[in-house]
Curated annotation (Swiss-Prot):
Annotated localization: Cytoplasm; Golgi apparatus membrane; Prevacuolar compartment membrane
Function per UniProt: Required for retention of late Golgi membrane proteins. Component of the retrieval machinery that functions by direct interaction with the cytosolic tails of certain TGN membrane proteins during the sorting/budding process at the prevacuolar compartment. Binds phosphatidylinositol 3-phosphate (PtdIns(P3)).
Major subcellular site: cytoplasm
Gene3D superfamilies with a match to the protein in the record: Phox-like domain
Domain-level remarks: The PX domain binds phosphatidylinositol 3-phosphate which is necessary for peripheral membrane localization.
Tree of life domain: Eukaryota
Organism phylogeny: Eukaryota, Fungi, Dikarya, Basidiomycota, Agaricomycotina
Domain PX stretches: 20-139
Membrane is among the record's keywords: yes
Family recorded in the similarity comment: Belongs to the sorting nexin family.
Protein name: Sorting nexin-3
Length: 144
């Protein structure tokens, strides 16, 4: 909604819900397993009013390998959109389960999802984006 110059914003203009919004937060990393079977997953909380999404509010857990598969599928599904890279893999001699490494990866995954989910073509036309963000039973094999 355009605002006229010199006229102060009304309360409704300042605090009303935007026409369409999509908010994503990656939080609450959890490490599971023992030894070589250890992995970390992250909670993805999504709030939206975009009709392409089935739920207004959702929370799912995903691990890094899920993000890798999601990115590959998204790249194939959306050939007209440049999909950003994921945060890099952890170096061999780095403890990938240290708090610092987990937080750096969480921040990188957050940036990745903000860019991807912020793209108008993907927001409204990507079935895999909606499923990845909202379906707790999401499985890459459904999309390959």
């Amino acid at each position: 909604m355009a605002r006229m110059a010199g006229r102060p914003q009304t309360f409704d203009e300042m605090y009303s819900v935007p026409e369409s919004f999509l908010e994503i937060e990656i939080r609450n990393p959890m490490t599971h397993g023992i030894g070589r079977k250890m992995y970390t997953d992250y909670e993805i909380v999504c709030m939206t009013n975009i009709p392409a999404f089935k739920l207004r509010h959702s929370a799912v857990r995903r691990r890094y390998s899920d993000f890798e598969a999601f990115r590959d599928i998204l790249e194939r599904e959306s050939t007209r959109v440049n999909i950003p890279p994921l945060p890099g893999k952890v170096r061999v001699f780095t403890n990938r389960f240290s708090d610092e490494v987990i937080e750096q990866r969480r921040e990188g995954l957050q940036r990745f999802l903000e860019i991807v989910a912020g793209h108008p073509l993907l927001q409204t036309g990507s079935k895999v984006l909606c499923a990845f963000l909202q379906d707790p039973a999401w499985d890459k094999s459904q999309w390959i």
